[in-house]
Each structure stands twice: as C-alpha cells, then as structure tokens.
Amino acid sequence: MKQNRKFFRRLLAVAFWLTVWQAAAMAIGQEVFLVSPVQALRTLVQLLPRADFWQRVGFSSGRILLGFVLGAVVSVVLAVCAARWSAADALLAPVMQLVKATPVASFIILALVWVRGSALSVLISFLMVLPVLYGAVRTGIASADVQLLEMAAVFRLPPGRRLRAVWLPAVLPAFRQGCSVALGICWKSGVAAEVIGLPNGSIGDALYRAKITLSTGELFAWTFVIILLSAGFEKLFLLALDKAVGAVLGEEGTKC
C-alpha cells in the first residue's frame, strides 16, 4: 500500500509538470521556442524506427560507458594506493581537486587538442568519473571498522577473507552511492563533449544539428532519450552491482 501511494505521488508530480510545460508551450505559441510535450513525444516516436537513431544511441552509449568503466577501475586502484601509501595520497590529492574544480567545457576544449572527436566522450567521461569514485572509495576505506581489522590481524586472516569480511562491507556502500552520482555525471559530460567535438553518428551531433536547424521538437526528443539512457543504465548497473555484492557477501551485501 505504501509503495503504491509513493508511486501515485510521483505520477501526480510528473503530471503536474507536464501540465505546466503544456501550458507554457500554449502561452508562447511558437514551437521554435518551446514545443509541447505532445509534439516532443510525437517527434521521438518518429525517430524510433530510423536506423541512424539506434546507431547514434549505440555509438554514444558505448563510448560514455567505456569512460565510466575505465574511470571506476582506475579510481579504485588509485584510492587503494592512496590509502596504503601516504606519498601516493599527497601526490593524488591536488590532481583530484584540480579535476573536480576545472569546468567540463575547459576539459573538452583542451582534450580536442589531444584526441579525436570520436574518442572525446570516452576521455571526458573518464575524467568526470575519476574524482567522484576516488573520493567514494577513500571514504569507504576510512570507514572500515578498526576493531575488525585488529581481530583480522590477531587471527591472521588471509588477504582474501580479510577483503571479504572487512574491506568490501566498508567500501561497497560508498562505492555504490558514488556510482549512482558518477553515472549521471558521465552521461551529461559525455554528451556535452559530443556537442562540442561533433563526432559523426553521435547523440551530441544530433543535438547540434537539431539546434542549428531550429528543430526544437527533435532537440527535446533527444534530450528525453539522454535522460532515459542515463536513468536506465544507472538502474541496470546498480541492480547488477547489488546482485554481484549479494553473491560475494551473502544476503547482507544486497542491502548496501
């Protein structure tokens, strides 16, 4: 019953904002400035059967998710090194702060000097994910139970069991939360990189073309696609992560 009530409230909230959008579109009365939600949905339906639509979705999804995976792997390795060696921590701290503080647009323009447009979204997604997950893993490592670590040392638990009994339960909740944030960031930054780099056959290229041709309906339709892809991949990844954690740690791990 509580779940149904929560779903109903969300549905009402969505309906409210769609009504506001529709009213604003009717008040403006010019689709070149603001299309109605009905027109945006109609444009999206027209895009769905086209082969180039799915090619663009595959092109952008593959590169953005590759950047996310690379960022996740490298951030875990660097966070472990920083926790293990103070020299590594001292070296990495200013780099991570610099990456976090630098505007995405600056990275994109600089990266255009180093890489081709087709690889730009991979690099930018990687850079945006890196400090988020690095910080999450560092937080998880710092939260490990000191008493459990002392017990593991006293009983001389092998590294594998120590990892499973102490480190993973401490790190995984923070890592999961970090992934939830990082996935959204990498989609936004990755598509922004495509809009500036304009690789052929990408979602960013489609957004730019819609903008210069004043196809506002197509602009909204592609934006809706990006939102769906970002939310969908986040849900699927977190579900897969929860299942993997459950398989490694047992039932308790699924609650992280």
Give the positions of each predicted feature.
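Non-cytoplasmic
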Residues: 178-228
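Generic hydrophobic transmembrane alpha-helix motif, especially the helices
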Residues: 97-132, 139
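Periplasmic/extracellular loop-to-transmembrane helix junction in inner-membrane transport proteins
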Residues: 27-69
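Short cytoplasmic-facing helical segments at TM-TM junctions of multi-pass membrane proteins
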Residues: 136-175, 207
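N-terminal signal-anchor transmembrane alpha helix
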Residues: 4-28
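Transmembrane-helix boundary motif in ABC transporter permease subunits
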Residues: 66-96, 109
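C-terminal transmembrane helix and the adjacent membrane-cytosol boundary/short C-terminal tail
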Residues: 86, 177, 221-256
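Transmembrane alpha-helices
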Residues: 123, 127, 160-193, 221
